[in-house]
């Protein structure tokens, strides 16, 4: 089966073709093209919805052409079209949804609507150490239940995955997502956009003295880390950074970046591990754009390996953490029984929930 995946939920235009050749679940990514809009949004320090939609409209056809050329295929070869319908920015979503519907109608192909959050989870479930170009996986019932942390610029959610297609959100951000907090702090520090990679890079340059804690001269709050629920809140952390910077005579940017990053990591890991214990999870998934953060991945792996109970840790390759068409295609395969040729049923939903 050849699946075309289309992703336009935010500011990345992603189109991919994934081959699922047998019932055992062996996947091969034939092509995975991503057109970034960083240059468009960098002057604003964040994504501007109307500009994002404009760039999607400009980029989507060239992306499709590149995807087909790299895979050496034609649209007539495609068996299923999968497209993100939400959650996300409605102007962006509409570009991808309408484009996918037009292709499905023209080439008489079945189409399936995909939840963006579920696709991030699918990317972790279907990934392996082989990486992006050619990898295999086998989804086993022994993986479940799963606790999935999906964390990006627009989302921070803890999801209980009871089985494929059975999801329950047990916690989410009440204000800023973790990735959004990175972006806003980076703007305060004039590090540019996107903020996550910039802060991560600067943080590696901080070297605390032997007699100092990691935080060095100051320590930022860990918002809601001890709350009994699994919700998150990162707007207060950004505010704490603002006031700390005002009080500092000399700003040590690497030190601030290291502390901001560690504060976010501490909260994300603490909540996830507590949820895994309560729900007796057999697997923990880390997914979404922020999952590409090397320090977050390292500390997650370390803390999970130190647990008394054996829990499998799954995280996609870094190039599958960002928004991409491959994860949409893989989610499409896992949900192929829901595909339709009634194209009017496929509608964008900016506030779509996974449960």
Q: What does each of the following model-derived ranges do?
A:
Residues 83-87, 103, 152, 285-293:
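Glycine-rich beta-strand-to-loop/alpha-helix junction loops that act as flexible
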Residues 2-87, 94, 116, 120:
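N-terminal beta-alpha supersecondary unit
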Residues 114-146, 331:
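Conserved phosphate-binding catalytic cores of ATP/NTP-utilizing and phosphoryl-transfer enzymes
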């Amino acid at each position: 089966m050849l699946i075309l995946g289309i992703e336009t939920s935010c500011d990345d235009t992603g189109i991919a073709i994934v081959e699922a050749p047998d019932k055992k679940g062996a996947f091969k990514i034939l092509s995975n093209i991503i057109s970034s809009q960083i240059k468009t949004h960098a002057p604003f320090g964040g994504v501007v919805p109307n500009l994002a939609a404009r760039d999607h409209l400009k980029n989507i056809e060239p992306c499709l052409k590149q995807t087909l050329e790299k895979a050496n295929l034609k649209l007539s070869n495609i068996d299923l079209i999968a497209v993100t319908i939400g959650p996300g920015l409605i102007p962006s979503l509409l570009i991808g949804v309408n484009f996918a519907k037009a292709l499905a109608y023209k080439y008489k192909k079945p189409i399936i609507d995909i939840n963006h959050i579920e696709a991030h989870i699918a990317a972790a479930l279907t990934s392996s150490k082989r990486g992006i170009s050619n990898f295999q996986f086998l989804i086993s019932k022994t993986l479940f239940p799963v606790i999935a942390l999906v964390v990006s610029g627009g989302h921070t959610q803890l999801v209980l995955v009871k089985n494929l297609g059975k999801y329950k959100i047990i916690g989410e951000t009440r204000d800023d997502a973790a990735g959004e907090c990175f972006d806003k702090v980076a703007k305060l520090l004039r590090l540019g956009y996107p903020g996550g990679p910039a802060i991560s890079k600067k943080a590696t340059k901080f070297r605390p003295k032997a007699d100092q804690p990691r935080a060095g001269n100051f320590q930022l709050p860990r918002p809601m880390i001890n709350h009994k629920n699994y919700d998150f809140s990162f707007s207060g952390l950004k505010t704490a950074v603002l006031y700390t910077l005002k009080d500092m005579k000399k700003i040590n940017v690497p030190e601030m970046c290291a502390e901001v990053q560690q504060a976010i990591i501490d909260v994300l890991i603490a909540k996830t591990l507590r949820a895994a214990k309560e729900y007796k999870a057999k697997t923990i998934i880390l997914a979404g754009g922020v999952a590409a953060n090397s320090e977050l991945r390292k500390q997650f792996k370390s803390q999970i390996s130190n647990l008394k109970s054996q829990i499998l840790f799954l995280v996609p390759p870094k190039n599958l953490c960002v928004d991409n068409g491959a994860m949409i295609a893989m989610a499409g395969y896992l949900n192929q029984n829901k595909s339709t040729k009634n194209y009017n049923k496929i509608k964008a939903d900016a506030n779509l929930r996974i449960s």
